[in-house]
Structures are given as structure tokens and as C-alpha cells.
């Protein structure tokens, strides 16, 4: 008798995705982040659902309702800390997942990669609208500054900004719709993640060598289920340490003050995971130029497959490209640091140089390195 998991219409899909899936035998821990992102999404949806049961999306009561969750709801403080720090873990895994894709040439699975970039943008949008909900000072002013960027769009900008606000400034209507967006977007992310997996399973996983692994595959279960379980334990350990011991480490102290439209905080800045893009935005002294650079800093990921010039897929055996990749990583860390600093020298010039280097590395230096490595591989005699 055939096993039920191989014949049942629903179980068959699960079986082909997580049990009998043929996986390359040599994929490293860098391939753990896909499953970790799935776990992060589940944690965020569950904690978010319970928080939404007690939250009120009204300007007069939003801040108080968050305080009420932390003080009066059973384990409400824990749910809130898990949700806030879960977002940080989500982005940490996202950045490592994208970095892995760039390093090992996974972007050559174009459909999977493009859906992944759309996923990244959707998660960023979700995190942004979510940050506004507690209605603290940084929530309010962050929303004001970022939504104001829409007004830089020629001709329709101001109308567009007012349409998003539901009035002439960030107010009650904005908070209500942001709560609605924050509730619906994770389910859209879940649907996109399923499509992402669907396209990935059309081709199968890439592997560190970048060579076609079809001749050497092993079943996903038990080999990679146990490997993913280890990653999950480490993720939960870090998340619990953050949520239980220093829940406010990655937050902004200004958000402990209720939103006040009459008092601007000295340094308006988003959460740490947006700082690299915020630094690129601020490094251009023109509003529209800054907005375009901000968009380009993320959308540039879409053209990475077109910029692949090397004969080898992975960077595993390409030392020059490796060096440039780690310079890019250091550059992004520098941009993250600059995004959190005030707009004054020497931070302005460092931010401008780092922003320039970011685009230069991706658009010019890395494709050139690929061509040079091709030349070096050719026999010279």
C-alpha cells in the first residue's frame, strides 16, 4: 500500500515540498535562512494577531492601548517584545538571505529572485506601517517624513501624499488605514512566499559550488529538517534573549513619548533595518533625487541577474568578486551607522562616499571583476 503522504492531494504537496524534496547534498548553513524567514513570518502573524485583539487604531487611545497591552494583558509585554524584536530578527534573516543569493549566484533563478525582491519590498512596507501604530514620537515623525517624500513626485506628488494621509497631515485617518495595511500585508507576504517556493521548486536549490547538483541529491527529510531545526533553535535563542533581557535595545527612546505634532524630535530616524536606505536618501541634497536614490538602492536588486558577467555562477572560486562582495557588506554596515547619525560633518561626506560606492560596486566594479576573472581563467599559452 502506497504511503498516504504520497497519494493524498494535500499531503502530496507538502511531501514534495518538505519531505521527499530532492536537495543538493552540499548546501551549507547559508541555506537555512529561507526556513527561518518562514518561522519569523509565522511568529509575527501569531503575536500580531493577539496584539491586534487589544490594540485600538485611534490617535487618542493608540499609545495608551499599547501601554495597556504591556501592563494589563496576560503576557502582553512578552507578546509585544516578541513582535517588536521579531521584526529585527526577520530583517536580519532577510539581509543574510539576500546576501547569500548574491554571493552564490542564486539570482540566476530569475523568477524566484524577482518574487524575492517583491517580498523584500512588501516586508519593508509592512514594517514601516507597523512602526507607526504605537503612535509614539518617532512613529508619528517617521510617518510624516517618509510619507512626505511622495510630495517630491512632480505634478501629482502633493495630491498623492494627501491621499495616503486621508487629510492634510498624518492624523487619525492615516493611523486607521496603516493598521488595516499592517493587518493585511502579512497574508499577502505569505501568498508571495508560497509563489517564491513554487518557482524555487521548479529549478531546485542552488548550492555553494554553483555547479548543477542533479547528479548528487538527497531527500530534504531528515537531513535538512534536522539542520533547519538547529537554525530554528539558534534563532529562538537570540530572539528570546532580546525579548526577555533587553527588549528596547533596538528601539528608539523617543517612542516612549506619545506623538506630539507640535514638538519635533532632534533626530528623526527609522528602525535600524531601514538606516542604510535612509542614509542614501539623506546623502543627496535634493528631495526628488534622494527619493529616486532610495528607490534605486532596493530596486537595483532586480537588475543584478543582468549584471552577471562571470562564467562561474558562484563566487566560491572568484577571489576578486569575493573581495568586492565583502567591501559591499562593510559599506552597507557603514551606511547603517551613518543613517543613525545627525546630519553634520563628517557624517555627511562619509554617507555620500558610501552611497556612491554602493552603486559603483554593484553597477560597475562587480561586473568588471567577473569579466576580468573570465580572462584570468583562459589559458595564456
Swiss-Prot record:
Could you tell me where this protein is found in the cell?
A: Mitochondrion inner membrane
Q: Which cofactor does it need?
A: heme b
Q: For binding a ubiquinone, which residues are annotated in this chain's numbering?
A: 201
User: Which residues span the membrane?
Assistant: 33-53, 77-98, 113-133, 178-198, 226-246, 288-308, 320-340, 347-367
What Gene Ontology cellular component terms go with this record? mitochondrial inner membrane; respiratory chain complex III
Cofactor stoichiometry and binding remark: Binds 2 heme b groups non-covalently.
Annotated PROSITE patterns? CYTB_CTER (PS51003), CYTB_NTER (PS51002)
Give UniProt keywords alphabetically: Electron transport, Heme, Iron, Membrane, Metal-binding, Mitochondrion, Mitochondrion inner membrane, Respiratory chain, Transmembrane, Transmembrane helix, Transport, Ubiquinone
Any Pfam family from its record, for instance, is Cytochrom_B_C
Locate the residues binding heme b b562.
83, 182
What GO MF terms are annotated?
A: metal ion binding; ubiquinol-cytochrome-c reductase activity
Which family is it part of?
Belongs to the cytochrome b family.
How does it associate, per the subunit comment?
The cytochrome bc1 complex contains 11 subunits: 3 respiratory subunits (MT-CYB, CYC1 and UQCRFS1), 2 core proteins (UQCRC1 and UQCRC2) and 6 low-molecular weight proteins (UQCRH/QCR6, UQCRB/QCR7, UQCRQ/QCR8, UQCR10/QCR9, UQCR11/QCR10 and a cleavage product of UQCRFS1). This cytochrome bc1 complex then forms a dimer.
What other note does the entry give for this protein? Heme 1 (or BL or b562) is low-potential and absorbs at about 562 nm, and heme 2 (or BH or b566) is high-potential and absorbs at about 566 nm.
Q: What does this protein do?
A: Component of the ubiquinol-cytochrome c reductase complex (complex III or cytochrome b-c1 complex) that is part of the mitochondrial respiratory chain. The b-c1 complex mediates electron transfer from ubiquinol to cytochrome c. Contributes to the generation of a proton gradient across the mitochondrial membrane that is then used for ATP synthesis.
Name of the protein in question? Cytochrome b
Species the sequence originates in = Pseudantechinus woolleyae (Woolley's false antechinus)
